[in-house]
Amino acid sequence: WNHYEMVYMLLAGLSTPLVLSVHSIVSFDFATSVIPGWHTTIFPPYFVAGAIFSGFAMVLTLMLITRRVYKLEDYITIYHIELMNIIIIVTGSIVGVAYLTELFMAWYSGVEAEQYAFYNRATGPYWWAYWSMVTCNVISPQLFWVKKFRTTPWIIVLISIFVNIGMWFERFVIVITSLSRDY
């Protein structure tokens, strides 16, 4: 068990900076681009928060299924699940604030192409993807403020699946809506 604990701590120590560096570097690739909709400095913390957000949602989905199949209710308690849901509320709120910050920065910059890129995301040909992203990533996690939703396993699985669908839509919206037209 000593070796297990040592390796466990080592992997935890390695994976934390790995997550931070990978998502920060990818976000800088976008942020240093001149393509409207990508050229924003909010991307590094936004991508890291999104990674934590979607990671917790995926872990919750798999954990609750595993908990049920292998009858681990005595080991993985509602208390543990509720704490994870609180992290989803916090990171989902951070992602929501990042969406609003992106819109504000596009408006405040006065750059017409940036303003159009964000207006086009919400009302253009891919409006359905944008609003699906907002619904899944910002609105659905807010249901966890209600204790019944935070402690009912099938509702938690449903919301965490919505979060992961929303994070897929986020990548779609960032990449496709910015590249789908010429500026």
State each model region's role.
Residues 1-133:
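Long, contiguous internal "core" modules enriched in hydrophobic/ aromatic residues
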Residues 35, 62-68, 146-147, 155, ...:
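Juxtamembrane/interface segments at transmembrane-helix termini
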Residues 97, 141, 171:
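Hydrophobic, well-ordered secondary-structure elements that form the walls
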Residues 107, 142, 175-176:
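Hydrophobic positions within alpha-helical membrane elements
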Residues 168-183:
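Membrane-proximal extracellular juxtamembrane segment immediately upstream
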